[in-house]
Amino acid sequence: MDLMSFKEKEISKKDCLELFEDTENFFDVIKLADSIRKDIVGDTVTYVVNANINFTNVCSGTCKFCAFKAEHGDPNAFFLNPDEVAKKALEARKIGATEVCIQGGLLKEIDTYFQAEILKKVKKITEPYEEIVVHAFSPMEVKSAAENAGLSVNEALKILKENGLNSMPGTAAEILNDEIRSEICPTKLKTSEWIDVVTNAHKTGIKTTCTMMYGHIEENKHLAEHLSILRKIQKETGGFTEFVPLTFLHENAPLHHMERVKSGASGMLDLKTYAISRIFFKDYIKNIQTSWVKLGTKLSQVSLNCGANDIGGTLMEESISKAAGGSYGTFMSEEKLKDMILAVGRIPKQRNTAYEIIE
């Protein structure tokens, strides 16, 4: 394998698969990814001061990797109304958050108009403190809410944008292969539907992130296929702001009890995934975010030398990873994030959702 030729050229899906299959050149792959990272984004590592607001844990979904879901009537079930969501957003804004990430569940009572009401309330209550960016509703949530409202996805996206939606999390992607999806999230939107929602969001002027959850039942060919789909979308729309690899947290997830399921990814696969993503995307998707919530502080720091250039956010509240067995906390102060970055010899810079540096 001529790794050095991969530095300049756009590698194919076949090349990508070969990198995942390769067991002999791990450190050379890491070194190449770090070199590409330095060429494209330099030594700056960005972070965002943000808050996660999960407005309900009640959901009709059947995702087998989710340990966060509750049923109606469960003692731990909760459902925040739009005013309660707005109050949480205001609290976050008052202590410096520039972004709130708002997500909920799949329920008949959650339609596009309910989502729009959340957006309006958040925008109104935070207006006196300078506008906060609302990064909200996964592609699955948008599709489900549109159906509940009797709207097309396009109609729903326009309503959400008009009411203050600034950007969307590109979650619900998991692995973009319908055979895998039929096993791990059988009632979630299909690959083509996920693509339809995000491409239409981009065309509506709503940027999104993109993600990939790995370390469960997928094979290397599925990882290469997934990255290839994301790059194709980015070439067409340019609407992805970042790529976030999400390592599967298995401890409390129902999926963990299925045969064939791995006990999460190895540390080697975690780092390899960051590296191969950087080599594959190059500057099509310039920003690759590491997740301290899922990897922990030390492995996140190592990933910054494997192609990643963003360390995510302060979060302030993050319930989903914690429910799945994540043990690295749900909040990290801005000072600690900066210390993490400085400790590996890189330059910390606060950014906004659009990756513009906040001086």
Curated annotation (Swiss-Prot):
GO terms for molecular function: 4 iron, 4 sulfur cluster binding; 5-amino-6-(D-ribitylamino)uracil--L-tyrosine 4-hydroxyphenyl transferase activity; 7,8-didemethyl-8-hydroxy-5-deazariboflavin synthase activity; iron ion binding. It catalyses: 5-amino-6-(D-ribitylamino)uracil + L-tyrosine + S-adenosyl-L-methionine = 5-amino-5-(4-hydroxybenzyl)-6-(D-ribitylimino)-5,6-dihydrouracil + 2-iminoacetate + 5'-deoxyadenosine + L-methionine + H(+). Binds 1 [4Fe-4S] cluster. The cluster is coordinated with 3 cysteines and an exchangeable S-adenosyl-L-methionine. PROSITE patterns: RADICAL_SAM (PS51918). Pathway: Cofactor biosynthesis; coenzyme F0 biosynthesis. InterPro entries: Aldolase_TIM (IPR013785), CofH/MnqC-like_C (IPR045567), CofH_family (IPR019940), Elp3/MiaA/NifB-like_rSAM (IPR006638), F420 (IPR034405), FO_synthase_su2 (IPR020050), rSAM (IPR007197). The keyword Transferase applies. It comes from the Archaea. Keywords: 4Fe-4S, Iron, Iron-sulfur, Metal-binding, S-adenosyl-L-methionine, Transferase. Its cofactor is [4Fe-4S] cluster. Pfam families: CofH_C (PF19288), Radical_SAM (PF04055). SUPFAM superfamilies: Radical SAM enzymes. SMART domains: Elp3. Its EC number is 2.5.1.147. Gene3D superfamilies: Aldolase class I. [4Fe-4S] cluster binds at C59, C63, C66. Belongs to the radical SAM superfamily. CofH family. NCBIfam families: CofH family radical SAM protein (TIGR00423), F420_cofH (TIGR03551), PRK07360.1 (NF005609). Catalyzes the radical-mediated synthesis of 5-amino-5-(4-hydroxybenzyl)-6-(D-ribitylimino)-5,6-dihydrouracil from 5-amino-6-(D-ribitylamino)uracil and L-tyrosine. Consists of two subunits, CofG and CofH. This is 5-amino-6-(D-ribitylamino)uracil--L-tyrosine 4-hydroxyphenyl transferase.
